[in-house]
Amino acid sequence: MIISESLKFLKKENKVLYWSGWFNAALFMLAFILFFVDDRQIMSINAWIKPMKFALSVLIYVWTFGWLLQYLPAKNKVSFISWGITLCMIVENIAIFFQAARGETSHYNISSALNASIFSTMGIFIGINSVFIFYTLILFFTEKINLDQASLFAWRAGLFLVLVGGAAGGMMVGNMAHTVGAPDGGPGLPFLNWSTVTGDLRIAHFFTLHGLQAIPLFSFLFASKTSKPMLYNIVFFVCYTGACVALHLFAMLGRPLFS
């Protein structure tokens, strides 16, 4: 019931990101079906697991952004950000699905001119997406936001963590791999495929990106019920960020988190 009401509200407030979310839900279902009818593997896992993961992640991302943008008073800026993010995510998913259909990896793949151009295009649009996130964070400091200070801090902190997660993603691009101490494609956790034999930078990347959901959710579900919500939000943010940094350093040492 809560989810249904939230989606109705999101549809009213931001149709662009509302339908963008449903588009990614459809992509997830498409990849889910293809998982059972196409047994080809890319780097030791089914070719359609990665498109599934990305479609689900983008779904969560765009609906979260649709929710937080309601607090910005300038609707023209909301529309600009919404369309920009939607376009960037469409390009990312097209690239990932196209490469999966070809039986090729999408990330760090420069084995041919086509593969290199696809990977470069993905990098460009992820960079543009990061600019939209940074712009939104600036607006959350400069615009008059109709939120209490504790909730406002939570959204600012979440946006900041997404940018940090993007920087961590940039490190993986610089490394041209997501594992440290062994080639990509080794044994990993089911579905997530996080390495169980060596360091994996994707773990910290995942949790940092989803700080956009974790910090505001903590604020809404727990901190807001206390007499000092700002203090609880700050403590949780520091602990959460510290854990993400620790996960990143652990991976940089080439140590698996799960084994």
Residue ranges of each PLM-predicted region?
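Glycine/small-residue-rich hydrophobic helix-like segments
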Residues: D184-N233
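Transmembrane alpha-helix/helix-exit interface in multi-pass inner-membrane proteins
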Residues: L161-D184
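Active-site acidic/histidine clusters and adjacent loop/turn architecture
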Residues: I126-Y135
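Structural signal for the C-terminal ends of transmembrane alpha-helices
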Residues: F65-L72, L137-N146, S219-T226
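Juxtamembrane boundary at the C-terminal end of a transmembrane helix
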Residues: L249-S259
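Interfacial segments of alpha-helical transmembrane regions
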Residues: K77-I85, K144-G165, P229-F237
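Early transmembrane hairpin module of multi-pass membrane proteins
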Residues: E5, N14-I126, A204-I215
